[in-house]
């Protein structure tokens, strides 16, 4: 039954994978690392860092869990291939920036079971699937940031940061990828395209959307393709 499958996955995560991490690294703060896993599972695709997580433990749970310990525990989880870390990359400045990273789960089934199959946000889950597939194909994957100047409601010039879901590199190849579950509204299209419009180079820019749509290019030269097509075609980025 579905319940048995879910219980099996939860048991595997807690009593095999997580227990192995705890025993191999002689972790004393067992409750804390369990909650840390839940925090990371709840925040796939959301930039965060050990300091933010420590503040969450202090304010919401009244638990002392230091930045250094959290950082070590995240490294242990990554070494066990439970999670992967994606660094933030300043596309215009051509440099890595800040302490914030995005964390993705290697096995979404285990992640979903850990959360009792709550928090099934389609966009973040799609993003995690695309990230995993890019790693499987041998690409180096970062999270992109593009700085732009815009005007606020009062007409003042303000600096804004736009995000590109993935900056994907392999040798001299590079792709910029946005992942969007829903592109039906003009507002959503503007949000997804605006980051790509402000990248000052000619590498391929791709938007992966829900569904099985074959690749096509819009008027701006961006490639748009369905998730199913992306996953089932190993050379899908070459369109």
Question: Model segments located where?
Answer:
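Short, locally clustered residues in the helix-turn-helix/winged-helix DNA-binding domain
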Residues: 38-42, 58, 135
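DNA-recognition alpha helix
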Residues: 50-62
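A generic structural signal for residues located within well-ordered alpha-helices
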Residues: 4, 28-31, 65, 125-126, ...
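Conserved NTP-handling cores and scaffolds of large molecular machines
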Residues: 16, 20, 40, 61, ...
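A cross-kingdom feature that marks ATP-driven nucleic-acid transaction machinery
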Residues: 69-239
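Non-catalytic, well-ordered alpha-helical scaffold segments
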Residues: 6-11, 30-37, 51, 68-71, ...
């Amino acid at each position: 039954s579905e319940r048995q499958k879910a219980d099996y996955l939860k048991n595997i995560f807690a009593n095999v994978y997580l227990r192995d991490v705890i025993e191999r690294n002689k972790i004393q703060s067992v409750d804390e690392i369990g909650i840390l896993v839940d925090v990371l599972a709840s925040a796939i695709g959301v930039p965060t860092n050990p300091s933010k997580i420590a503040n969450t433990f202090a304010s919401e749970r009244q638990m002392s869990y230091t930045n250094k310990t959290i950082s070590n525990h995240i490294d242990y989880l990554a070494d066990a291939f439970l999670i992967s870390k994606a660094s933030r990359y300043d596309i215009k400045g051509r440099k890595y920036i800040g302490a914030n990273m995005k964390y993705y789960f290697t096995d979404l089934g285990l992640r979903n079971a850990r959360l009792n199959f709550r928090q099934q946000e389609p966009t973040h889950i799609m993003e995690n699937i695309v990230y995993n597939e890019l790693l499987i194909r041998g690409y180096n994957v970062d999270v992109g940031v593009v700085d732009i100047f815009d005007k606020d409601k009062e007409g003042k010039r303000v600096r804004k940061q736009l995000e590109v879901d993935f900056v994907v590199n392999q040798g001299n190849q590079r792709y910029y990828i946005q992942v969007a579950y829903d592109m039906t509204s003009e507002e959503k299209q503007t949000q997804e395209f605006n980051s790509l419009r402000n990248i000052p180079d000619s590498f391929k820019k791709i938007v992966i959307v829900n569904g099985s749509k074959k690749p096509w290019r819009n008027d701006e030269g961006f490639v748009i393709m369905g998730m199913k097509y992306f996953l089932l075609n190993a050379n899908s980025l070459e369109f």
